[in-house]
Amino acid sequence: MTREIKVGIGDYAVGKGEGIISTYGLGSCVGITLYDRVTKVGGLLHALLPEAARYGHRGNPAKYVDTGLQLLLKEVLKLGASKFRLEAKLFGGAQMFQNIKSDELKIGERNVQTAKRELKKLGIRLVAEDTGGRGGRTIYLDLSTGKVRMRKVIGGQVIEKVY
C-alpha cells in the first residue's frame, strides 16, 4: 500500500522515492510542488496568503507563498535534491467569490503571481500549472515519478488531469 502524507493549509511536506504527498481543498490557496527527477526528492507546499511582510510576518512562515517556498526548497535540498534540476508545478489560486472588485481581496490571483515571481527569483523552472477559475482543487504528488494528479470540481463536474 502506498504511503500518503496529507498536507494541511499553511503547511508543507517532503519525501523521497516512494509515496504520495497530497493536499485537499485548494481554493484561493496555492499548492506548489518541487521535484528532482534524478534523486526522486519532492515536496508540496499549501500556502494561504502571498507575502509574509504584507501581513507583518505573523504566524507560521509556511502560511505564505514567499516564505513557505523558501522553507520547502531548503527541505528538498536537505534530502538530496539539486536546485538546478528542480521542477515546479503550481495549482489553485481560484477566485472563490464572484463579485470582488478590490485587487487587495483577489487573494488567489495574488498567490499565483507571487508564486511565479518567487520561483523565477529562485531560478526554479515552472513546468506545469492549473490555476485561477472558480473551482476547488485537490492534488497528489507521486514521489516515484514527480507526476501530479489533480482533481477539480466545477459546477458539480469532477475533472481529473495528470501533470
UniProtKB/Swiss-Prot annotation:
Keywords: Chemotaxis, Hydrolase
The keyword Hydrolase belongs to this UniProt entry's keyword annotation: yes
EC number: 3.5.1.44
Listed GO biological process terms: chemotaxis
One Pfam family here: CheD
UniProt-listed InterPro entries: CheD-like_sf (IPR038592), Chemorcpt_Glu_NH3ase_CheD (IPR005659), Cytotoxic_necrot_fac-like_cat (IPR011324)
Keyword Membrane appears in the UniProt entry: no
Molecular functions per Gene Ontology: protein-glutamine glutaminase activity
Function: Probably deamidates glutamine residues to glutamate on methyl-accepting chemotaxis receptors (MCPs), playing an important role in chemotaxis.
Protein name in UniProt: Probable chemoreceptor glutamine deamidase CheD
Organism: Pyrococcus abyssi (strain GE5 / Orsay)
Source organism phylogeny: Archaea, Methanobacteriati, Methanobacteriota, Thermococci, Thermococcales
